[in-house]
Structures are given as structure tokens and as C-alpha cells.
């Protein structure tokens, strides 16, 4: 049985009177591609933000590789949680910052591609490498740790070769076609050496051929790097083609989970996506 990588336990996220995520539980195991879909477009990115430290959940907890990285139990008893500076202490709230979560092995991309627009393809990936190295931008700039810098440059080039962007390494990131910009963003996430890769609408803005190529690319990098992949996506063909398991939420509440075949035949999912004719 594969080890559990991500576990979301009874997470609720509320903004004022709006409940974006309602008591959601889900998990992803080692080596899986798990998708989260929502016909109403609400709640998917919110749960991503709870997992990656952008939001503190209103209630519930997020566990990554056995460690609690986010938790809020306002109505519960003080619990012994294990996360960074909270290690071994009794507390109701745990919230690791996004940079600490990245260093633990979670990387994400965004629906709207976020690249360093004035930097080259090569430098976009190299900058991401610094997040997991002992050197920083200052030491790299003044070559205070030249051996580590050289190793990072070699690794950056190798990663660009793997994702098919080595020939464009000296071009500005924004000069790339949209599909290649998405590959670059994923390459930058891979540069942090994640265990869990979270993809937020990776096929957004792509044409059908680019979407087909992206689907194969996701499977290839998952296998090559031994990743667990968690994605949210509107392109149902992509989701059904590559996912091992799928969770479906409707207005922030989970209505179904299962294999692609099970989800396609689930009456609650069919109703949520297609509606019910009124008599």
C-alpha cells in the first residue's frame, strides 16, 4: 500500500458569511495523480491556498507526510501538533508560512502563470533552485559559494532539457508560446525538488493540442521524479485521462470521490454538472 502524502481533515474555510470550503476531507497517496473538480468554480483554489500556507483554515487540519502543516481547532481541545516551532507543544492553531511549506516538499503552480518576466528561461529556474540550497541570491551574485552555484547551473540546464526548454534557455520567459510558459512554470516548481506537485488549472488558456501534450507531460514528470500530483482543472478530458482518483465538490462541499469511471457514473456529479430539469 502506498504511503499517505497529503491528508486534509475536515477543513472549512470561511470568509465572513461565505463558506468557500465546507468540512472537506481528502487525501493523496504516494505516486498518485489526484484531481479536484467543481462545476461552480468555487473552493478549489481556496483549498490549495489552505494547503500551501496562504490561508489559515477556519477549522480542520492539513497533514503532509505525517506532519501537521496547518490546523485550526477553535472549538476543540488543545492538541499536541507537530509542525516547525510548534513541535511538541499543545496548541489549537498551526500555520506554516508558504516558504517553509515549500522547503518541506510542496510546490505549486498558479492558474495565471507567474514567471519572472524580465528574466531568461534559465534564470527563472535557477532562482527557484535557491529556495532549497544553502546559498542565497547574495552569495550567488558575488560567487561566495561558487561550487554550489556551478552545481545549480548544471542542474538547471539538465532540468530544462528534461522539460524540453534547453534550446530556449537564453530567451526571455515572456517570449515563449503559452504552452511552453506553462512548462517553464512547472520546471520552476520541480527545481525545488517537491514530493507533492500542486497544479492549479494547468491547461487554462491552452488549445486542444497543447492540452493533450500537457497531459502526457504531467504523467511523464510524475513518473520520472516520483511525484504525487494534486491538480484542479476544468478540462474534463485531461482530468479523466490522467487521474487515479477524483474528488468533486459543489459549493465547497464534497459530493463524490472515486476513480474516473466511478465519477462519470455518479448521479450526484451528473446532477451538479448537468442540472435537473424542472417539471
Each model region followed by its residue ranges:
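Glycine-rich phosphate-binding loops of nucleotide-dependent enzymes
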Residues: 2-279
Amino acid at each position: 500500500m502506498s504511503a499517505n502524502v497529503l491528508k486534509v481533515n475536515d477543513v472549512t474555510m470561511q470568509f465572513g458569511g461565505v463558506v468557500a470550503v465546507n468540512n472537506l476531507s481528502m487525501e493523496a497517496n504516494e505516486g498518485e495523480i489526484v484531481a479536484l473538480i467543481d462545476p461552480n468554480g468555487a473552493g478549489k483554489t481556496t483549498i490549495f491556498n489552505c494547503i500551501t500556507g496562504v490561508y489559515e483554515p477556519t477549522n480542520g487540519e492539513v497533514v503532509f507526510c505525517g506532519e501537521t502543516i496547518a490546523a485550526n481547532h477553535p472549538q476543540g481541545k488543545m492538541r499536541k501538533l507537530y509542525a516547525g516551532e510548534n513541535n511538541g507543544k499543545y496548541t489549537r492553531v498551526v500555520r506554516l508560512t508558504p516558504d517553509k511549506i515549500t522547503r518541506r516538499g510542496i510546490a505549486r503552480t498558479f492558474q495565471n502563470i507567474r514567471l519572472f518576466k524580465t528574466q531568461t528561461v534559465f534564470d527563472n529556474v535557477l532562482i527557484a533552485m535557491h529556495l532549497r540550497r544553502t546559498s542565497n541570491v547574495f552569495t550567488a551574485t558575488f560567487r561566495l559559494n561558487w561550487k554550489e552555484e556551478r552545481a545549480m547551473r548544471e542542474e538547471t540546464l539538465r532540468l530544462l532539457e528534461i522539460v524540453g526548454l534547453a534550446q530556449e534557455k537564453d530567451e526571455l520567459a515572456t517570449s515563449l508560446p503559452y504552452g511552453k510558459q506553462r512548462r517553464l512554470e512547472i520546471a520552476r516548481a520541480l527545481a525545488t525538488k517537491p514530493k507533492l506537485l500542486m497544479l492549479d488549472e494547468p491547461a487554462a488558456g491552452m488549445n486542444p493540442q497543447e492540452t493533450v501534450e500537457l497531459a502526457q507531460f504531467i504523467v511523464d514528470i510524475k513518473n520520472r521524479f516520483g511525484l504525487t500530483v494534486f491538480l484542479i482543472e476544468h478540462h474534463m478530458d485531461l482530468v479523466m485521462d490522467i487521474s487515479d482518483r477524483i474528488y468533486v465538490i459543489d459549493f465547497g462541499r464534497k459530493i463524490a470521490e472515486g476513480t474516473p469511471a466511478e465519477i462519470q457514473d455518479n448521479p450526484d456529479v451528473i446532477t451538479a454538472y448537468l442540472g435537473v430539469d424542472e417539471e
